[in-house]
Amino acid sequence: MRIVLTNDDGIEAPGLLAARRALEEVGEVITVAPDRNRSGVGRSITFGAELYVEERRMADGGVGYACSGTPVDCVRLVALGMVEGFRPDIVVSGINHGENLGDDITYSGTVAGALEAIVIGVPGIAVSLSTGRPWHGADGREELHFEPVARFTARLAGLALRDLPPGRILNVNAPNLPEEELEGARVTRLGRRFYQDELIEVRDKNGRVGYNIYNNPPGHHDEEGTDFAALQSRRISVTPVHLDLTDTAGLKELESWDIGRLVVR
């Protein structure tokens, strides 16, 4: 199994290293990740500029590649032949430092990296660990348990390669617990967030007005069967996700609007 591994926290993130160690037990892994933190970039790509890649020695002595672009760029580079003779069978993105649940997944560079697997025609898995703070804001006081979900992902990758239908990825989220405290895993649907941000005006030293808008943690609706509910019950959540955003249930209703009459000849 040939695995391309990426993330959005950057090449030096500890979750990336934990994922690589586990995945190397089940396949050949090429690690290509952003050269800096790219959290929240979604499916953005690099237009009108070159992508630069440099070999980087990782904390365990292994070799990875640091890319100047986004997680999507990283996956596309490997798919197009950046590493001679290597064509990925599956994409794994993560392990993200912080959960990617519910409505938040459309913001996520981690999930976007896995979604690019659909574009290149292979299965994909996005993996995140629910932590108190994102990696770039961590203060080192929170104990992090990447290894349980890393091992789970390595086992899941084999199943996904064999059985996951085309056009679909798996979004995996794990509570930050040691393996013996996990209550298993559950197949879930995406939950629903509600956001509590405020508009706060600030001024820099030159008097220029700016705004702080992402300042309060989001909440979520308590609903059974969701990814949120799984984590609250100390379980790993696995949610199937596809790239086609068409609201098929809304097609018939929209057809009743007779929008053709809006075109004036």
UniProtKB/Swiss-Prot annotation:
Domain of life assignment: Bacteria
GO molecular function, one term: nucleotide binding
Compartments it resides in: Cytoplasm
Amino-acid biosynthesis keyword on record: no
Matches recorded under InterPro entries: SurE, SurE-like_Pase/nucleotidase, SurE-like_sf
E.C. no: 3.1.3.5
Cofactor: a divalent metal cation
Keywords associated with the record: Cytoplasm, Hydrolase, Metal-binding, Nucleotide-binding
Pfam families: SurE
Binding site for a divalent metal cation: D8, D9, S39, N96
UniProt entry tagged with the keyword Coiled coil: no
Gene3D superfamilies the record matches: Survival protein SurE-like phosphatase/nucleotidase (3.40.1210.10)
Cofactor note: Binds 1 divalent metal cation per subunit.
GO CC terms, sorted: cytoplasm
Catalytic activity: a ribonucleoside 5'-phosphate + H2O = a ribonucleoside + phosphate
Family: Belongs to the SurE nucleotidase family.
Function summary: Nucleotidase that shows phosphatase activity on nucleoside 5'-monophosphates.
NCBIfam families according to UniProt: PRK00346.1-4 (NF001490), surE (TIGR00087)
HAMAP family registered for this protein in UniProt: SurE
The protein's name: 5'-nucleotidase SurE
